[in-house]
Amino acid sequence: MIEIQNLTKVFQEQTVLQNINATFDAGLIHGVIGKNGAGKTVLLRLLCGLMHPSKGQVIVDGKQLGKDVDFAPDAGIIIETPCFLPYLSGFQNLKELASIRNIISKEEIAEAMEQVKLDPSSRKHVGKYSLGMRQRLGIAQ
């Protein structure tokens, strides 16, 4: 479960999000929709622990992001156009990202790719992937 309590984010003097409160139950898929500049990406970054709030808190499974844990290990975001290093294979991209999270098991990376129907042994560079393949790689991430 993810709980948002009085979440506010201010950049310089501009308030992007103000006093957001919500609860997201575990096991469900949620989406965020809104106009350009509404703060959707900022909210998602806050929910994953990729950014810290100016005020308020995000609680994931009873643990406060930024206090009890630095990031939400079981949460992720898939953006419309995922960004990967185009000159590396899908496996190499995931390996680079996994090293940031101290995941060194090649088997875990290969399993994540297989779950989204991508071949971990393929040497095909991500720059040659279709948008759908890049989005599936984003899910594996």
How does the language model describe each region?
Residues 33-35:
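The feature captures the beta-strand-to-loop junction immediately N-terminal to the Walker
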Residues 48:
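Helix-to-loop junction immediately C-terminal to a conserved catalytic motif
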Residues 56-71:
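Conserved ABC transporter NBD signature motif
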Residues 2, 17-19:
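Conserved structural motif at the start of ABC-family nucleotide-binding domains
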Residues 95, 106-121:
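Conserved ABC ATPase "signature" region
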Residues 139:
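Hydrophobic anchor residue at the start of the ABC signature
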Residues 14-15, 69:
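Short coil-to-beta microelement around the adenine-binding A-loop and adjacent beta1/P-loop entry
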